[in-house]
Amino acid sequence: MNSTKIDPKFIGRSNPRVGLIALASDFMIEKDFINVIKDKKIDFFVNRIECYNPLTKENLIKMSNKVTDVTKDILPDQDLDCVVYGCTSGTIAAGHDTIEQKVKIAKPMAEVSTPSTAAIQALKKLNIKKVSIFTP
């Protein structure tokens, strides 16, 4: 009988880890997110958060109360580099600082982003001072 010793190879550091908190009712956010990061070396993990009907400020704030638990379940006991809370209206209703605090309880080392805060940062970076919106 022949045997060959194979020494294991360890990866010292993985790609940046991004966790997404997706609304239970949002069927597209993962696909959209993957399209944004597809050519980048990013490891992407998702968990869903329960949403409540009707969509009221009170229900959006109620939903935000679950952010810490939902965040904990994204790679439990592992660090993430960034956590994205994928609910624009929920961020505005509860406040970005509140969402950030709730995420940091579960993943203290993670940066926190939301669609609304990312848009504001992009507008500032591009030095855009005025935005016009046309809706029906």
Regions found by a protein language model. Give the residues of each.
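N-terminal glycine-rich anion-binding loop in soluble enzyme alpha/beta folds
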Residues: 1-69, 136
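Nucleotide donor/acceptor-binding cores
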Residues: 16-18, 126-129
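Short histidine/acidic/glycine/proline-rich micro-motifs that form metal-
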Residues: 51, 88-91, 119
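Phosphate/pyrophosphate-binding loops at sites that engage ATP/ADP/AMP, CoA/4′-phosphopantetheine
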Residues: 70-80, 122, 127
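Short acidic, glycine-rich surface-loop motifs adjacent to enzyme active sites
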Residues: 74-92
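Short, acidic/small-residue loops that bind anionic groups at enzyme active sites
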Residues: 100-123
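An alpha-beta-alpha
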Residues: 128-136
